[in-house]
């Protein structure tokens, strides 16, 4: 058999094969970069926004918009129609709205729709700190536009802060500032504690998160609305305040829910002592052991 490795044809053939292999490797690398893009460098990630992150911001904007629009619309309808909705009805509207938004947007953005929840998650390392400003801004914009929509839709009076017209869809203390602050702190603490339990703990039944959180909001509105307007959400209070220019007690609704949410998240993290599944905890529970031993 003739040796072709030393002649011109043999060398040219080897070069063609090597070039083809190189082109194929480069093509595969390009396809890999398309389907699995490499993470941006730190300095680039701060200047650019990915499409999935924009989708999350849009989800937070829409979620907060519909939350404030639906919940506050029930308040307006109740005020303008001789309390036809009633307090329990308003509480049900807020609770159901939260529930359906969690089920529809939770898989996209987490369905925070509340700056206090976003800040609380970030404080305990469950949410990227650098994404907090964008989330909060989206939520506040959604709340503000919802309040503006209601103002145009129902023709609400401009002079709502003077007390002459009792149709203000924002939040204001019914009693003293101390009562409102304390109530907002407690109900938001309770809400965030429940959120941490059903939405972040892998031992909980995640499918029931929306129902549990919505029910918590419903209960909180029932007990807190006559005292503090039951905000539990700085964005929900800030949006209407910006639209109406009415800032009475606004500091309460910015500070108390935020502190309450942070405290609720941290307290739950403190009592969350194990990562065992619920069935293992049940089997090894000291109470059940005692009962079984006593019964034998």
Curated annotation (Swiss-Prot):
Family: Belongs to the MIP/aquaporin (TC 1.A.8) family. NIP (TC 1.A.8.12) subfamily.
Originating organism: Arabidopsis thaliana (Mouse-ear cress)
Source domain of life: Eukaryota
PROSITE patterns: MIP
Reported tissue expression: Expressed in roots.
Function recorded in the entry: Water channel probably required to promote glycerol permeability and water transport across cell membranes.
Name this polypeptide is given: Aquaporin NIP1-1
Location of the motif NPA 1: 114-116
BP GO annotations: arsenite transport; hydrogen peroxide transmembrane transport; regulation of defense response; response to arsenic-containing substance
GO cellular component terms listed in the entry, alphabetical order: plasma membrane
UniProt motif (NPA 2) ranges: 233-235
TM region positions: 57-77, 84-104, 136-156, 180-200, 205-225, 249-269
GO terms, molecular function: arsenite transmembrane transporter activity; water channel activity
N-acetylmethionine carried by residues: 1
Disulfide bonds: none
Protein's membrane topology: Multi-pass membrane protein
Keyword list, A-Z: Acetylation, Membrane, Phosphoprotein, Repeat, Transmembrane, Transmembrane helix, Transport
Signal peptide range in chain numbering: none
Domain free text: Aquaporins contain two tandem repeats each containing three membrane-spanning domains and a pore-forming loop with the signature motif Asn-Pro-Ala/Gly (NPA).
């Amino acid at each position: 058999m003739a040796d072709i490795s030393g002649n011109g044809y043999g060398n040219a053939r080897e070069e063609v094969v090597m070039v083809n292999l190189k082109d194929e490797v480069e093509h595969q690398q390009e396809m890999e970069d398309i389907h699995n893009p490499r993470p941006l460098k730190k300095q680039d990630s701060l200047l650019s926004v990915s499409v999935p992150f924009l989708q999350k911001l849009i989800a937070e904007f829409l979620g907060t918009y519909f939350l404030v629009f639906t919940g506050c619309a029930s308040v307006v309808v109740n005020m303008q129609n001789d309390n036809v909705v009633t307090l329990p009805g308003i509480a049900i509207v807020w609770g159901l709205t939260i529930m359906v938004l969690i089920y529809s947007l939770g898989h996209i953005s987490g369905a925070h729709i509340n700056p206090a929840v976003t800040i609380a998650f970030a404080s305990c390392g469950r949410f990227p700190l650098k994404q907090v400003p964008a989330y909060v801004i989206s939520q506040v914009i959604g709340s503000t536009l919802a309040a503006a929509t209601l103002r145009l839709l129902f023709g609400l009076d401009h002079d709502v802060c003077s007390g002459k017209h009792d149709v203000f869809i924002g939040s204001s203390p019914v009693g003293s500032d101390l009562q409102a602050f304390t109530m907002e702190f407690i109900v938001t603490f309770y809400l965030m504690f429940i959120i941490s339990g059903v939405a972040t703990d892998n031992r909980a039944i995640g499918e029931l998160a929306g129902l549990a959180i919505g029910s918590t909001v419903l209960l909180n509105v029932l007990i807190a609305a006559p005292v503090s307007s039951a905000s539990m959400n700085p964005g929900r209070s800030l949006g209407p305040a910006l639209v109406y220019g009415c800032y009475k007690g606004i500091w309460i609704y910015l500070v108390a829910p935020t502190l309450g949410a942070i405290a609720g998240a941290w307290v739950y993290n403190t009592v969350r002592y194990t990562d065992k599944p619920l069935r293992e905890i049940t089997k090894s529970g000291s109470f059940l052991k005692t009962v079984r031993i006593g019964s034998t």
